[in-house]
From Swiss-Prot:
Region described as Disordered: spans on this chain: 205-237
Protein name: Non-structural protein 1
Gene assigned in the entry: NS
Gene Ontology molecular functions: protein serine/threonine kinase inhibitor activity; RNA binding
Function noted in UniProt: Inhibits post-transcriptional processing of cellular pre-mRNA, by binding and inhibiting two cellular proteins that are required for the 3'-end processing of cellular pre-mRNAs: the 30 kDa cleavage and polyadenylation specificity factor/CPSF4 and the poly(A)-binding protein 2/PABPN1. In turn, unprocessed 3' end pre-mRNAs accumulate in the host nucleus and are no longer exported to the cytoplasm. Cellular protein synthesis is thereby shut off very early after virus infection.
Post-translational modification: Upon interferon induction, ISGylated via host HERC5; this results in the impairment of NS1 interaction with RNA targets due to its inability to form homodimers and to interact with host EIF2AK2/PKR.
Pfam entry (one): Flu_NS1
Subunit structure and binding partners: Homodimer. Interacts with host TRIM25 (via coiled coil); this interaction specifically inhibits TRIM25 multimerization and TRIM25-mediated RIGI CARD ubiquitination. Interacts with human EIF2AK2/PKR, CPSF4, IVNS1ABP and PABPN1.
Length: 237
């Protein structure tokens, strides 16, 4: 096993422990608490994959961080923080929308790289909007926290979430997963829109209505439908 993978996990465990202490003292805002919950699931998955105990890893991570802080001067810390790019946390969904449980009548699940896509195939002829909470850096999506598909009535009918056992994903991973989710929902004649925030940072190839261009498969399906309609009209004449 790569020692850097182990030490990274150990440090992440300790830093999560520190953030948990901040949350317990009611010093964290909603995005902070949101990331805390998500990262806890991720650490559990990584610990299971690596075969490492989280409590033991936390103790070792503390020793690593303490050694680094002891060796680093205040001036070096200031320079590091000044040169580090700052990310922004953007929210389409409320805490209630993110934490709400939902169920599927006809569940379908697909894993696309480090992301899990879930949708309810029983949903038909609905207007659906995709919303997401994520961080942005350099005007591009950095980390997806959670994406969900909502009907006009507010029901959740689809979701994209990072796999705890496979931390880390790219902007392209998210974009591909969004395409899969949209394609699955549109297959049942649903109309899907993407939130303005997602359009700007994660789904740039969309038109002015916030809908992505048709895929080649969708274009072929539409062409067959049009040809069929034309034939019927000719026969009626």
């Amino acid at each position: 096993m790569d020692p850097n993978t182990v030490s990274s996990f150990q440090v992440d465990c300790f830093l999560w422990h520190v953030r948990k202490q901040v949350a317990d003292q009611e010093l964290g805002d909603a995005p902070f608490l949101d990331r805390l919950r998500r990262d806890q699931k991720s650490l559990r998955g990584r610990g299971s994959t690596l075969g490492l105990n989280i409590e033991t890893a936390t103790c070792v991570g503390k020793q690593i961080v303490e050694r680094i802080l002891k060796e680093e001067s205040d001036e070096a810390l200031k320079m590091t923080m000044a040169s580090a790019p700052a990310s922004r946390y953007l929210t389409d969904m409320t805490i209630e929308e993110m934490s709400r449980d939902w169920f599927m009548l006809m569940p379908k699940q697909k894993v696309a790289g480090p992301l899990c896509i879930r949708m309810d195939q029983a949903i038909m002829d609905k207007n659906i909007i995709l919303k997401a909470n994520f961080s942005v850096i350099f005007d591009r999506l950095e980390t997806l926290i959670l994406l969900r598909a909502f009907t006009e009535e507010g029901a959740i009918v689809g979701e994209i979430s990072p796999l705890p056992s496979l931390p880390g994903h790219t902007n392209e991973d998210v974009k591909n997963a969004i395409g899969v989710l949209i394609g699955g929902l549109e297959w049942n004649d649903n109309t899907v829109r993407v939130s303005k925030t997602l359009q700007r940072f994660a789904w740039r190839s969309s038109n002015e209505n916030g809908r992505p261009p048709l895929t080649p498969k969708q274009k072929r399906k539409m062409a067959r439908t049009i040809r069929s309609e034309v034939r019927r009209n000719k026969m009626a004449d």
